Amino acid sequence: MLIKDTSQVPAQVVQEGIDLRWLIAEKEGAPNFAMRLVTIQPGVVFTPHHHPYEHEIYVLEGTGVVTNPDGDVGVMQPGIFVLVPPDEIHGYRNTGDQPLKFICMIPLQH
């Protein structure tokens, strides 16, 4: 069993104003899924992108929107969860005055 605090995990800068912490992955003994903590600073846009795998999101703190090529498609606030299907173009924008934080789960075998 693994029990840690997120502050014990180093942050990786994804782009300016956005960091990612790999909380659980293969090196922690998880064979199937990775759990990541994403933090987006106020006013920052996570550039639209896509992946060949699904991912699941659960919003912890802050406010923002999920975007796709057509514009804003959903509000992000604590308690909201999002399923992003494989290869769907998506991005995020922090619309609040506090960091937007969410858990993002992805499969390790992709």
Regions inferred by a protein language model and the residue ranges of each:
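Short beta-strand His + acidic residue motifs that chelate non-heme Fe in jelly-roll/DSBH
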Residues: 47-48, 66-67, 84, 89-96
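Short strand-connecting beta-turns/loops that link adjacent beta-strands
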Residues: 28-29, 71, 97-98, 110
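A generic "binding-loop/recognition-motif" signal
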Residues: 52-53, 72, 88-89, 98
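A short, N-terminal "cap"/entry segment at the start of jelly-roll beta-barrel domains
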Residues: 1-32
